[in-house]
Curated annotation (Swiss-Prot):
Entry's family note: Belongs to the class-II pyridoxal-phosphate-dependent aminotransferase family. BioF subfamily.
Gene3D superfamilies, A to Z: Aspartate Aminotransferase, domain 1 (3.90.1150.10), Type I PLP-dependent aspartate aminotransferase-like (Major domain) (3.40.640.10)
GO biological process: biotin biosynthetic process
High-level lineage: Bacteria, Pseudomonadati, Pseudomonadota, Gammaproteobacteria, Pseudomonadales
Protein name: 8-amino-7-oxononanoate synthase
Subunit-structure text: Homodimer.
NCBIfam families: bioF
Domain of life: Bacteria
Any one GO molecular function term: pyridoxal phosphate binding
Residue positions binding pyridoxal 5'-phosphate: 106-107, 176, 204, 233
EC numbers for this chain: 2.3.1.47
Gene name as annotated: bioF
Pfam families for this protein: Aminotran_1_2 (PF00155)
EC primary class: transferase
Pathway(s): Cofactor biosynthesis; biotin biosynthesis
Amino acid sequence: MSFDLASRLASRRAEDLYRQRPLLESAQGPDVVVDGQPLLAFCSNDYLGLANHPEVIAALRAGAERWGVGGGASHLVVGHSGPHHELELALAEFTGRPRALLFSTGYMANLGAVTALVGKGDTVLEDRLNHASLLDAGLLSGARFSRYLHNDPASLAARLDKAEGNTLVVTDGVFSMDGNLADLPALAAVAQARGAWLMVDDAHGFGPLGASGGGIVEHFGLGQEQVPVLIGTLGKGFGTAGAFVAGSEELIETLIQYARPYIYTTSQPPAVACATLKSLELLRRESWRRQHLAALIARFRHGAEALGLTLMDSFTPIQPILVGGSRQAVALAGMLRARGIMVGAIRPPTVPANSARLRVTLSAAHSEAQVDRLLEALGESWRQLSSSLLAEIEAEEGDDA
C-alpha cells in the first residue's frame, strides 16, 4: 500500500489548515520585507528587540573571527568551546542556580530533560496546553503520561495521587498561544507535597518577566527548591538561538550522561554563544526595554478592548485576539496584510477547535505610533470581516428561501 500524501494535503487545504512559509527578505525587526512586500510585523518572538541589535551583531562577528563558524563536534567530543562554557556559567549565575547546560534548540532541551529524568515505571504529568515539544517529550519518555486540566492545581493533585515511580510535573511558564502565566506557586506546592519535581519551560518568560528579566520564576519569587528543572530558550527574549537547562549540579551531570539530544548532536556555533553573552548583558542592564514593552502591552489592550475585540487574560507580549473559525482568522490576517500589517493566524491543531486566533506579539523595538497603526488596521479589518460574514449569512438565507 502506498502513502496517499496528496489526499492528506488536500484535506488540510479544504479545512483551511494548510500552512505555508512566508519568505523573510530582511533582518528581523518591526519593519520587514516578506515575499517582496514591506510590512509592519507583530508576529516575532524577539520580545526585547535584541535580534538585530548592533552590539549583538558585533559580538557574533568577533566570535566568528576568533572561533570560526561550526561547532565541529558534539559537546562530549571536541565541540564544547570556551564561549559555550562561559555562557553556561553566565546563565547559571543569571538564574541563581549552580549549573546550566546549553542545547541547540528549545525542542531538544525539553526532549532531553524529560527523557533523561523519567522512563518506564515513572510518571509524567503535563498541562493540557503545554507546547508540542513538551507533550512529545512526555510521550517519548516511556513513562506513564497524563495531562491535567489547564492551570488547575486540583486536577494535578488528583493525578499525582495516582502517580507511580519518579514523578515529573511539566508546565509552560508562559503559554505560547494564550499568553497567560502558569500558577507556579500553587503548582509547586502541590508537587512538593507529593514528592514530585516541577519542570518549567519558560521560553516566553525570560526577558519580558521579572525585575531583571529572569522570567516567571523571578516574577513569583520562587527558587530551585520549588522549581528543580528550569528551561529557557535563547531565540526569543535573548534574540539569538539555542536553549538551556538550569538546575543543580546533579541535574546537569545527569543530563550530560543521559540526555540523548545533548549527547548525539553537534554543538551550536561558538559565535552564537558569543552573541548570547552580549544579549544577556543587554537584557539585564537595559531595564527600559521591559518598561517600554509593558507600556506598549497596556496601550494595545486598552485600544483593542475599545474596538470590541476579544482578548485573553495576558499581560505578556503575547496578545491573542480570539476569532473562532479558521477561515475567519485567515481572512482577518489577510485583510491586515493588505493594510501593511503582518500578524499570524493560529489555527487547529495548534489551538483547540473553534478557537482560531490572531497571535499579536509585541516587542520593545515597536513604537507607540506603530501600535496605534496596528489598532487602526484592526478596527478597519474587523469591520470589513463583520460585513463579509453578514453578507454571507444573508446570501445563505436567500438561497434557503
